[in-house]
Curated annotation (Swiss-Prot):
SUPFAM superfamilies: P-loop containing nucleoside triphosphate hydrolases (SSF52540). GO terms for cellular component: cytosol. Mg(2+) binds at T25. The lineage of its organism: Bacteria, Bacillati, Bacillota, Bacilli, Bacillales. This is Shikimate kinase. Catalyzes the specific phosphorylation of the 3-hydroxyl group of shikimic acid using ATP as a cosubstrate. Its EC number is 2.7.1.71.
Length: 186
């Protein structure tokens, strides 16, 4: 039996993907509160468990260590937890195993923000995002566009331009509830 069918749609974790700084954590917390679900931010969980910031982990243990740890956390949540709202780090969905597991076992929502709106936030993000360190705006745009191709593998896309986090969260919750009401298990 397909693993996706084994998990009832209402019980599936909701996974938020998108480029760094699009609002996955803020929106995820709001959605979790509105749906009475637990919220898990993968990056925050790793920081807590290792008692280091992501930039420190990159510096002291390396990106490969971080990506391996990130994968372990995400696969565990996908396979062993239900009813969660999960925010993935901006680069985690690049890993095929993570992508496939999330798409098979969860509902994956792509929070989509235009480059024009994202670059207005760039100065606030660079210090806390090691992947952005020492990159020009052109290099950041290239990374943004490369990742967008990966984020196109999702169950649903939510355009977030010119919307507040509260408005995005309300839209997600309303859409999920409609989908859950329409879904009839076979």
């Amino acid at each position: 039996m397909n693993a996706k069918r084994a998990i009832p749609v209402r019980e599936r974790n909701i996974v938020l993907i998108g480029f760094m700084g699009v609002g996955k954590t803020t929106i995820g917390q709001l959605v979790a509160k509105k749906l009475y679900r637990d919220f898990i931010d993968i990056d925050q969980q790793i920081e807590k468990d290792f008692n280091m910031s992501i930039p420190e982990i990159f510096e002291k243990k390396g990106e490969d260590f971080f990506r391996k740890t990130e994968k372990e956390y995400i696969l565990d949540i996908c396979h062993h937890k239900r009813f969660k709202i999960v925010s993935l780090g901006g680069g985690s969905f690049k890993q095929e195993e993570i992508r496939n597991c999330c798409l098979e076992n969860c509902l994956v929502l792509h929070l989509d923000l235009s480059w024009e709106n994202w670059k207005q936030r760039a100065d606030l993000l660079i210090e806390s995002r090691p992947v952005l360190h020492n990159r020009s705006m052109d290099e950041m745009e290239q990374l943004f566009n490369e990742r967008k191709v990966i984020y196109d593998k999702h169950n649903s896309k939510v355009a977030t331009d010119n919307l507040s986090p509260e408005e995005v969260a309300d839209y997600i919750v309303e859409t999920l509830k409609i989908g859950w009401d329409l879904y009839q298990p076979m």
